[in-house]
Amino acid sequence: MKFNKAYVLMRQGKKIKLPEWQGFWAWENNTIMLHCSDSVVMDIRDTDDVSYTFSFICREDWLIAE
């Protein structure tokens, strides 16, 4: 699905991810939290490479994380 739909679902409490990810993104404390495969959890606003992180938003293969 496109990110705009995934974002709405995330705001409703769903966790979202891309097919190759082991981690997921979730809406927590009024921000997107990145739950990485290595158990690191970080606020999207604290990402080191904003361009890399936001390039995912252009993708159309978002999934609900189970």
Name these PLM-found stretches.
Residues 1-8:
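Surface-exposed ligand/attachment interfaces on beta-rich extracellular proteins
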